[in-house]
Amino acid sequence: MAWISRYSMLVVLLGLCLIFSFATLTKQQPNPPDAAEQMLQALRAVTPQRVLVISSNSREDLDFVDALRGKFETLTNKDPSWTVSFVAGTPQDARKAIDGSSSNRLTLVVSPDAQPWKLFEGLAEKFPGKELRFVAPEPVLWPSFLKSQNLINIVNQIVIIAILAIGMTLVILTGGIDLSVGSLIALSAVICTLAIRDWGGGEQADGGTILLCGLLALLVCALAGLVNGLLVVYSELPPFIATLGMMLIASGSAFLLCKGQSIAAVPDSFVWLGRGTWFGLPVAVILMAGMYVATHIVMRSTVYGRAIYAIGGNVEAARLCGIRVRTVIVTTYVLSGLLAGLGGLVMASRLKSGDATYGAMYELYVIAAVVVGGTSLRGGYGSVLGTLVGALIIAVIENGMNLIQIESYMQKVVFGLVILGAVLLDRNARVRR
């Protein structure tokens, strides 16, 4: 039965997905490719005629039009008697297109978001002399939780916490903790955007300048992590106290640098890291996934990874085995600071600005993700993949409760219960081990 304990959090994640799927089951529009196929099948049953595809400018509607355009190209190539045109925009744009049509017989294919337009009520009275046929995708029974865009949003909204949680996992595995990561988010965002504004040309900054300013912010955060590590191993300060002090220093420094004002003088290209997509997926999500894969390999297949587990299990035994305990511990804090800085860059890119208020309370969510993912607060036991599962559990709970309209105050209660439950499970597992 050891596998039950090992994969318990993954089972919890799947269970939560199942619960929220049933809770959000409702009739809704099919995804764009399915809706396009549905429309094509409906039109094949009628006499060839002129077709006008009407849509709004929403993202889902434009995806629907793109999918339908490809299918109509195949259809018109096989049967030239079909004539298809497209209009995207407002009800006024659609009316102009209908009035301007040279054909008296017209089939209107209407996208999901355009269906509620009052333009389509009483078509015969509004367009006398034209024979109009209204065709629209039929709604299907499907959970709002499992819509592809919602699933992407779940992962996308947890990216920053998940990136920080990698470094926090390494620190906690050694028996430490890092409370400064939330403030380092703000410090990183402020330093990067301030450097772009004051030294990099502001809104005219090029890609190379943005990269250098980002590296500067990462360097400062890594140095903050280095100070944390040195205080812990050489001054023998408790990690809680050392990183609490750095949290206050970083937060105060961020406010001093930006003078309490948001810094928004950055170029449009600055948002690529936080909002850009690659092969249909957010760039930040791809970055996060790559980092988790790389860290998992390091922790499972390298001497450094095994040293971290050894230190968390028994510091003295690790030292007697020849492990450079102090060096390893310091590097975990450096990595934690570096990844907190990266999280700050993602947040600044996503919001297209830097602000000293960024990252408030994030350290608690990061620690929660690590603990919920099964990493022991005493060190020596856990994994980064477990941390990813923990971060996803937090994101799924938040997203699911928003979908079923649970108020934010109750969400905090639920998060607190989840954290307490995870710690109790960790305690019981430690007793069994």
Describe the role of every protein-language-model region.
Residues 1, 172-177, 205, 220-264, ...:
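Short loop segments and helix-boundary regions at transmembrane helix junctions
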Residues 1-31, 37-41, 96, 125-129, ...:
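Cytosolic-side transmembrane-helix boundaries in multi-pass membrane proteins
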Residues 10-23, 112, 167-169, 217-221, ...:
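Hydrophobic core segments of alpha-helical transmembrane domains in multi-pass membrane transport
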Residues 52-61, 77-83, 174-176, 180-226:
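Membrane-embedded helix boundary and interhelical linker motif in transport proteins
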Residues 147-199, 230-236, 374-384, 417:
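Single transmembrane alpha-helix segments in multi-pass membrane proteins
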Residues 210-213, 224, 280-354:
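Helix-loop-helix "hairpin" substructures at the membrane interface of multi-pass membrane proteins
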Residues 239-302, 328-331, 350-359, 406, ...:
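Transmembrane helix-bundle core of multi-pass membrane transporters
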Residues 340, 350-416:
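Transmembrane alpha-helical segments in multi-pass inner-membrane proteins
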